[in-house]
Amino acid sequence: MNLSQLLPDLTEVPESLVDEAIWDTFTSWTTGRGINLYPAQELASLGILAGDNVILATPTGSGKSMVANAAHFIALARGQRSFYTAPIKALVSEKFFALCDIFGAENVGMMTGDATVNGNAPIIAATAEIVANIALRDGAEANIDQVVMDEFHYYSEPDRGWAWQVPLLELSKAQFLLMSATLGDTHWLE
């Protein structure tokens, strides 16, 4: 059973308990897979649930992908559209298939510039440039409620950094999860 099949019927949940129902469903899924969230994963995921923008600068292998899964699940449960960005098409493709396994192929799409698969899906894996171009074209009115930016340290690259910077400036209504193992001090971003 994929994670989207576990989505609670939130119409039956009192508004004051919606976030709790979403969180309980997600943590039941992780526990069912034998995964206990690390403190940093839980803190970041709860920040996303609370509507915060989150910077997750933790080492390789510390579970950033699980926080991204939580973010996508939270957005999906709320009827929102989320985008996952990566710097290269091969990583986008890899993440697309991983997200299909977790959320079901009907809920996941991919946009790379070369190809678009299921482009109207609620969860989209895309290159950073795709999201930046959507942000430039549509601004705050873009059909993007949440952006998970992996490898966010690319923001400082002279040639491609714009693709990580533009969404932050133009997608003023979107929630962001910025992830990197090599970002360094993030206090200036907060």
Model region roles, listed by residue range:
Residues 45-54, 63-80, 100, 165-170:
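Walker A/P-loop NTP-binding motif
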Residues 58-60:
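The conserved Walker
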Residues 53, 80-82, 107, 120-123, ...:
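Loop/turn-to-beta-strand initiation segments
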Residues 65-66, 80-101, 130-133, 181-189:
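Conserved Walker A/P-loop ATP-binding site and its immediately adjacent core
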Residues 1-55:
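Helicase-associated low-complexity/disordered flanking segments
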Residues 112-145, 155-156, 161:
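Conserved helix/coil segment N-terminal to the catalytic DExD/H
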Residues 153-190:
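Post-DEXD/H (motif II) to motif III coupling segment of the RecA-like Helicase ATP-binding lobe
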